[in-house]
A protein has these predicted regions:
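Glycine-rich nucleophile elbow surrounding the catalytic serine of serine-hydrolase chemistry
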Residues: 132-137
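Histidine-centered catalytic micro-motifs
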Residues: 126-130
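Cys-dependent protein tyrosine phosphatase-like superfamily
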Residues: 22-124, 139-185
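Intrinsic disorder/low-complexity segments
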Residues: 3, 21-22
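Bacterial N-terminal signal peptides that target proteins for export
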Residues: 1-11
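Bacterial N-terminal signal peptides
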Residues: 10-20
């Protein structure tokens, strides 16, 4: 079996493992209901990931109360400037590194990794449309920056929502694998 096929098989195994999570794997993070945020998941004290901000009026104060210092938007889009204004008005930093699901351009990943690795930004909330890009980007950070194995980072990403619950999830898994394999130290 070649390296790419082995990696795909390992990631598929990780997805299956995440689907039958044990109590010990539940310590990886915690899904929390945050008003105005779709699929909020607290990874640890420095980072949370999630899907779209569905209500700025509810989400921004809730994120502020949770101590979030920086919001990283991986979706971008038409609402990004209004979201930026609300986040910055609340005294938080707002960064956009839009990753397009059609073009799959990896260019936003390097600046994302820099921002997501900067303790001055912590705690950070990383979000995208459904949370898949956020979990995928965090998986890349865990492997490329933190030195985790793909398998360990994949389990965490699957727990955070990078699962086959929509058509884009397999695309993001492949995007993460390709980026990791071309940037792994």
């Amino acid at each position: 079996m070649n390296r790419a096929a082995s990696t795909r098989a390992a990631v598929l195994f990780v997805v299956v493992l995440a689907g039958v999570a044990t109590p010990s794997s539940a310590q990886l993070g915690q899904r929390i209901t945050v008003p105005g945020v779709n699929n909020f998941w607290r990874v640890d004290k420095t980072v949370s990931t999630g899907g779209s901000i569905t209500s700025r009026e509810m989400a921004v104060p809730a994120l502020k109360r949770r101590g979030i210092r920086t919001v990283i938007d991986l979706a971008g889009g038409a609402d990004a400037e209004r979201e930026r204004a609300a986040v910055e008005a609340a005294g938080m930093k707002y960064l956009v590194f839009a990753i397009n699901g059609t073009t799959l351009d990896p260019a936003p990943i390097d600046p994302f990794l820099k921002a997501a690795s900067d303790p001055a930004n912590y705690p950070v909330f990383i979000h995208s449309g459904a949370g898949h890009r956020a979990a995928m980007a965090w998986m890349i950070k865990r492997v490329v920056v933190d030195g985790w194995t793909i398998e360990k980072a994949g389990i965490e990403a699957a727990s955070a929502g990078l699962i086959d619950d929509n058509a884009m999830a397999p695309v993001w898994w492949k995007f993460a694998q390709d980026y990791i394999m071309s940037h792994k130290k």
